[in-house]
Amino acid sequence: MATSISLTRYLVEQQRAGGLIPAQLRLLLEVVARACKSISHAVSKGALGDVLGTAGSENVQGEVQKKLDIIANGVLIEANEWGGHLAAMASEEMDGIYLVPHRYPQGEYLLLFDPLDGSSNIDVNVSIGTIFSVLRKPDGERRVEETDFLQPGTRQVAAGYCIYGPQTMLALTVGAGVALFTLDREQGSFVLTQENLRIPEETREFAINMSNMRHWAAPVKRYIDECLQGRSGPRGKDFNMRWVASMVADMHRILSRGGVFLYPWDRREPHKPGKLRLLYEANPMGWLVEQAGGAASNGRQRILEIQPTHLHERVSVILGSKNEVERVALYHGAR
């Protein structure tokens, strides 16, 4: 029987292999993984742990917070603030950045996260997850500022997500492909179950909320309409639609077997370039997809090359199988 490889061993081996992961980053990723295990435990309790329902508050985006949103956010902060690996954190659930208190050692990294993506699905027991991204803080001894987080996705040094479903699984990249780990609940550790995930360039599946079709721009309408025409249309093949309304769940499926995920701009909020957050969702997922051989675009530009202008910036998102993403970009007139 093959020896199982734990997340810790995997990270140590990556550290040894040409210094892909500095020691401080390795330790940070282990702490993030432990926090995800705690969140998984809280999620699995459901009604028995009094963690379902709303918290009676809103986040900076004006969205009603679930109890588990707040619990997961607190778990990630408390787990990471004292280890000496971080200088500051930013979360979809917080207005501003969280500076590591002076009483703790200051590290060289910045951690960004969506503590519980897809939280609208919590009460109906659909897969949800945590998305995270790691950046280096700028050089110097000065205190970290919000502008230090406004780095394009190309500067990420690690990114991943943890999905809480029938199994708890962790997808991770440090710039050398995507590895997938499964939580062994008996051992209490994440175990490597797949390396070098690859998204096929061609697909017959798309993920989008079709109920919003009347609000989309013409290029997205054209793309979806051609997919729906199936074998008798210009694409010459039948497509299936999949939509979980949980980005982590939809993207996990696409990383596992291919597909394209679209969350486009729509006319209901024309002043906003999209719905999903660039720093907490689009950048980490975009890097994972690219590391698996896929593509990530907002329709006109590679997502990872977008220069953020504020902490909670939103973007239009097209992620997944390379040929489909490029087709949607072509319809938008992207070069």
Curated annotation (Swiss-Prot):
InterPro entries, per the entry: FBPase_C_dom, FBPase_class-1, FBPase_N, FBPtase, Fructose_bisphosphatase_AS
Cofactor note: Binds 2 magnesium ions per subunit.
Residues that, per the record, bind substrate: D117, G118, S119, S120, N209, K275
UniProt-listed Enzyme Commission number(s): 3.1.3.11
Involved pathway(s): Carbohydrate biosynthesis; gluconeogenesis
GO BP annotations, alphabetical order: fructose 1,6-bisphosphate metabolic process; fructose 6-phosphate metabolic process; fructose metabolic process; gluconeogenesis; sucrose biosynthetic process
Classification via Pfam families: FBPase, FBPase_C
Binding of Mg(2+) 1, residues: E92, D114, L116
Keywords noted in UniProt: Carbohydrate metabolism, Cytoplasm, Hydrolase, Magnesium, Metal-binding
GO cellular component, one term: cytosol
Reaction(s) the record says it catalyses: beta-D-fructose 1,6-bisphosphate + H2O = beta-D-fructose 6-phosphate + phosphate
Signal peptide, first to last residue: none
Residue numbers binding Mg(2+) 2: D114, D117, E281
Protein's UniProt keywords contain Magnesium: yes
Cofactor(s) the record lists: Mg(2+)
Quaternary state and interactors: Homotetramer.
Matches recorded under HAMAP family: FBPase_class1 (MF_01855)
Assigned protein family: Belongs to the FBPase class 1 family.
Identification of the protein by name: Fructose-1,6-bisphosphatase class 1
Organism: Verminephrobacter eiseniae (strain EF01-2)
Gene assigned in the entry: fbp
